[in-house]
Amino acid sequence: MKFLRETGFLALSALFLLVELGCGDQYRPVANPIVSPGGQPQTTHFAWVVNYNANGDGSTTQIDVSGDTNTAVNAMGVGSIAEAFPVNSLALYVANSGDDTVSEYVPTLSGPVTTINLLPGSHPIALGTAQNSAMYVLNSGANSACPSTGSISVIKTATLSVTSTTCVGHNPTALAQSSSSGFVYVVNQGDGTVSVFNPAGPSGMGTVTGLGQNPVSATASVNGNWIFIVTQGDGTGPGTLDIIDASTAGGATTVAASVSLGVGPTISIIDPNLNRLYVANTGGNSVSVFDASNVNPSNSPAMPLLGTASVGTSPIGITPLANGSLFYVLNSGSNNVTVVSANSFSALTNVALPTGADPVFIASDPTSSKVYVADKGTSETTIIQTSNNTITQNIPAPTQVSGCTSSCALQQPMMIVTE
């Protein structure tokens, strides 16, 4: 079972990275990990880190959870930035923003790596799926199919071929798929809209009406019936969580209800073990925790707030442990990780990250023993042992130039998935 941060599929786990991709343009890809259920039968677990290289081929590194060692490095395309596993699949897909490709390989077999070509100019920044048969790729750039907007490309996993490319809005940054209806939702930060895509078409279903101001991320509920859209508002006050009934075409493009969030919310994470939704209020230095098992647009509120946790400065990522005891919050402003009780929602301790870490992503393994942080600034992955909340290793990323032996610039970790 793969550990991704939003449910239903893996969007971009580069939780709100600020990355420069070609022509000086900046994009903030959003990803949502899906938390694996606990009690996994595997005896060996791994974390896979995607490493970004603006000047050449990126890579994935494979970290052995039990030994805290880098056991494999695989070369990807230029500007590797996001990764995802299809449902019940051993194949890992990596989006390469710099050369308009997606890499696919089976980590347990150590390759070979297959390169899937997208349309030139696509600049893929996120990918994910709630299916086994298809992978959805979010493209931020203009291509021949969509010369004035972003797009979403569909890869058929059986043939590793692109079957369609459909236009979405401007500067798309996040996507989520309903496992019940199959509808895919794309957040377009450039024009403040959310596009709805029906893979069965394939066709666009239009945009969601009734949205709050400035949508930034999307997450699917455990059963796939609901899509949660985080909106920031004007940035100075509370944001909102807009709830969409994704179970039928009739309600798929309309906000059914909204609940209030903290200041400057950015990302949301679903925890399938406790059936909770966590939202990072980046501007308010807090995390809102909701009961996602009890969604009813007719109620007020439409989804009960269980509690609010005070954390560090500018939280941008959350990973709940699979055993349900704790959740870990990545704080970019204070350069640390806050450990929070999943019962009392009180902060237990803060784990300081290396100086200059510039952390961008956080994940935990299915055994609840390790937490992983992608440190873009120091080009390493920090490993936190959850039994005592201490750092056990800082594993460096590969060099930007293959074979470099002296004064070597390193690639930048961007995203992590575990199993």
Question: Which residues are covered by each model-predicted region?
Answer:
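Bacterial N-terminal signal peptides that target proteins for export
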Residues: 1-11
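Bacterial N-terminal signal peptides
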Residues: 10-20
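Predominantly soluble domains enriched in secretory-pathway, periplasmic, or organellar proteins
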Residues: 23-419
